[in-house]
Amino acid sequence: MNITAIFVTALLLSMNKIGGEPMNYDAGVQLEEACHNDHLVLDHDMNFRSLTDEEINLICKVVMTEARGESNVCQEAIATVILNRWLNPEKYPDTIAGVIYEPNQFAIDENIKPDVGVRVAVHNAIIFYNTYQMQIPYQVYWFRADHYHEDLGMPYISIDNTYFSIDENALVN
């Protein structure tokens, strides 16, 4: 049983009875299907959004380029920043490629081969998105090496040598 299957099984079990009522059948089927699909992200409205193999590989290339040598936790957080932007089309492009190729946003080596550690970090960012196991909240849109951005968001957390900033409006809501 893969980690996605374990996570979704636990989620199904925890949702089986809410307020004494059985879980909605359609929701159960959707969650069970997620067990067998490592390409689904649970968005802010609790709907599953699908990623293609090409999109996942693109995220892996960015993470490998931006965070080679950093911890799995840092790499997962960087992948989460990409997902955060993708799932916020009011501020950012609504495609993974659009987010990644937006001018001056992410470094990417098109010829790089992401290693297993990076693939695990990206996989974790996808399956744990919008759960209590996310490395960073969905309002974190920026990161950089060595220090926080001076003009984007507010300092949130540093992981290894990478500094993540949160949208200042997130703290108001």
Predicted feature locations:
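Cell-wall glycan-active module
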Residues: 1-50
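Bacterial extracytoplasmic/cell-wall-associated proteins, especially those involved in peptidoglycan
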Residues: 31-173
